[in-house]
Amino acid sequence: MSKVKSITRESWILSTFPEWGSWLNEEIEQEQVAPGTFAMWWLGCTGIWLKSEGGTNVCVDFWCDTGKQSHGNPLMKQGHQMQRMAGVKKLQPNLRTNPFVLDPFAIRQIDAVLANHDHNDHIDVNVAAAVMQNCADDVPFIGPKTCVDLWIGWGVPKERCIVVKPGDVVKVKDIEIHALDAFDRTALITLPADQKAAGILPDGMDDRAVNYLFKTPGGSLYHSGDSHYSNYYAKHGNEHQIDVALGSYGENPRGITDKMTSADMLRMGEALNAKVVIPFHHDIWSNFQADPQEIRVLWEMKKDRLKYGFKPFIWQVGGKFTWPLDKDNFEYHYPRGFDDCFTIEPDLPFKSFL
């Protein structure tokens, strides 16, 4: 059979997906985190892989699904949180814009799986399945009640799950995980389709979402999930030493308030007394596309007048950030390679060929 006749849609998908293969899995496994540091990788959306100097591996909000893929149904799902928020009827054109950089089924070394809240782009059944099938049988699944309910519903044993609420602390080897208050108002209107929100006091946030502070021997990382801006960031900054803070940034469409703005990101960094502030989530949805350079421009305008004690860092999906080695950098660039140029003799027709 000719090659073109043997190729199918399925063979094409299997040969190209996930786009990065196991490249990042291997990089994370091979990384030796130096004492006094921690390393983390951006997995897309708010997904983070954190590795401590003791070799402890935890992932947060690792999501392996996609957004809209068809114009088939022009209407938004009845009762969707965005419909409640803005009174819209049309389908939200949120297409996934970044590739899959980590293969969940190539994960072998992991010490905990965490989720910030139960929205589809923060918790993933494929990740749960891969960890259950391929990793140690004592890896815990940590999250608020709504996330644990999802995991158990998918088949994760109850005894493998840990429900956390603000104030709880979970120790995973040399990483101390603090569950803190979340400020994700969108989560409060994520309700069953037949349930009305109008005129009804929302139930508490604590069962739905938490923020996380990861305290490692080499520094601390604040993960805010999908939280909006809140004055309570200042309380968290008063109570904890925060080195690096991650915040959900995006260009909110007309009639929508779901992501922090560039000004919100700076206010968050100041309130938390962070050393570095990194935007995330702006990478993933086409209709929330935003330029993170706006944060840096605004920071440059304000930093001297307001005496900011933090710097912004513009990351790329799949990239690594090491605290404190990268604390004075402003932007990430993927490794460019060719550092070994001219270690062997070039094979060119003549020296001035290039």
Curated annotation (Swiss-Prot):
The reaction(s) this protein catalyses: L-ascorbate 6-phosphate + H2O = 3-dehydro-L-gulonate 6-phosphate
Keyword Kinase: no
GO function terms (MF aspect): L-ascorbate 6-phosphate lactonase activity; manganese ion binding
Cofactors required: a divalent metal cation
GO cellular component: cytoplasm
Places the protein is found: Cytoplasm
Signal peptide: none
Major enzyme class: hydrolase
Induction (free text): Induced by L-ascorbate. Repressed by UlaR.
GO biological process per UniProt: L-ascorbic acid catabolic process
EC number: 3.1.1.-
Record keywords, A-Z: Cytoplasm, Hydrolase
Pathways per UniProt: Cofactor degradation; L-ascorbate degradation; D-xylulose 5-phosphate from L-ascorbate: step 1/4
Gene3D superfamilies in UniProt: Ribonuclease Z/Hydroxyacylglutathione hydrolase-like (3.60.15.10)
Claim: Cytoplasm is one of the keywords in the record: yes
CDD domains to which the protein is assigned, alphabetical: UlaG-like_MBL-fold (cd16284)
InterPro entries per UniProt: L-ascorbate_6P_UlaG, RibonucZ/Hydroxyglut_hydro, UlaG-like_MBL-fold, UPF0173_UPF0282_UlaG_hydrolase
Record-linked PANTHER family: L-ASCORBATE-6-PHOSPHATE LACTONASE ULAG-RELATED, UPF0173 METAL-DEPENDENT HYDROLASE MJ1163-RELATED
Entry's family note: Belongs to the UlaG family.
NCBIfam families: PRK11709.1
Function according to Swiss-Prot or TrEMBL: Probably catalyzes the hydrolysis of L-ascorbate-6-P into 3-keto-L-gulonate-6-P. Is essential for L-ascorbate utilization under anaerobic conditions.
UniProt-recorded name of the protein: Probable L-ascorbate-6-phosphate lactonase UlaG
Organism: Shigella dysenteriae serotype 1 (strain Sd197)
UniProt gene name: ulaG
